[in-house]
Swiss-Prot record:
GO terms for biological process: photorespiration; reductive pentose-phosphate cycle. InterPro entries: RuBisCO_ssu (IPR024681), RuBisCO_ssu_dom (IPR000894), RuBisCO_ssu_N (IPR024680), RuBisCO_ssu_sf (IPR036385). RuBisCO catalyzes two reactions: the carboxylation of D-ribulose 1,5-bisphosphate, the primary event in carbon dioxide fixation, as well as the oxidative fragmentation of the pentose substrate. Both reactions occur simultaneously and in competition at the same active site. Although the small subunit is not catalytic it is essential for maximal activity. It comes from Flaveria pringlei. Keywords: Calvin cycle, Carbon dioxide fixation, Chloroplast, Photorespiration, Photosynthesis, Plastid, Transit peptide. One of its GO terms (molecular function) is ribulose-bisphosphate carboxylase activity. Residues 1-54 form a transit peptide. Pfam families: RbcS, RuBisCO_small. Belongs to the RuBisCO small chain family. Its main location: plastid. It comes from the Eukaryota. It is found in: Plastid, Chloroplast. The basic functional RuBisCO is composed of a large chain homodimer in a 'head-to-tail' conformation. In form I RuBisCO this homodimer is arranged in a barrel-like tetramer with the small subunits forming a tetrameric 'cap' on each end of the 'barrel'. This is Ribulose bisphosphate carboxylase small subunit, chloroplastic 4.
């Protein structure tokens, strides 16, 4: 018996470009909008701080820990702390006091993974002051905490109970020598 095999040839044709297709990205626009010549390096036109560099100081890198918001400033007075608490209350944040007896700064002891630090969570002084409307109430609690723990770091935080986030935190008191 004879075997007959048949081969079918298929022809593929390229389809013409569709009229509604978006043109491919061809690069940036021409350089016509940019200046053709480079400016000379004329340093007399650079911005200046008016020679105030001589009176600026560098934060000493040793022996001075940086804590939180406002930590680069000198210790705040009672009046300045009260103004910060007023700001916190104006923003409808709930004031809360926290204190730490041993480590007033973040450190690494229990884990070496990136982003994890010990010392971020301090002991809360009483309960958050929900309904507080006067900075004098917060300052009274601060004085009580200082009286109970004179060698503690004490910070005031502002908590937004709607978004459930801490919005502000600053050191209100540090132990002697810090």
């Amino acid at each position: 018996m004879a075997s007959i095999s048949s081969t079918v040839a298929t022809v593929s044709r390229a389809a013409p470009a569709q009229a509604n297709m978006v043109a491919p990205f061809t690069g940036l626009k021409s350089n016509a909008a940019f200046p053709a010549t480079k400016k000379a390096n004329d340093f007399s036109t650079l911005p200046s701080n008016g020679g105030r560099v001589q009176c600026m100081k560098v934060w000493p890198p040793l022996g001075k820990k940086k804590y939180e918001t406002l930590s680069y400033l000198p210790n705040l007075t009672e009046a300045q702390l009260a103004k910060e608490v007023d700001y916190l209350l104006r923003n409808k944040w709930v004031p809360c006091l926290e204190f730490e007896l041993e480590h007033g700064f973040v450190y690494r002891e229990n884990a070496r993974s990136p982003g994890y630090y010990d010392g971020r969570y301090w002991t809360m002084w009483k309960l958050p002051m929900f309904g507080c409307t006067d900075s004098a109430q917060v300052m009274k609690e601060l004085q009580e905490c200082k009286k109970e723990y004179p060698q503690a770091w004490i910070r005031i935080i502002g908590f937004d109970n709607v978004r459930q986030v801490q919005c502000i935190s600053f050191i209100a008191s540090k132990p002697d020598g810090f």
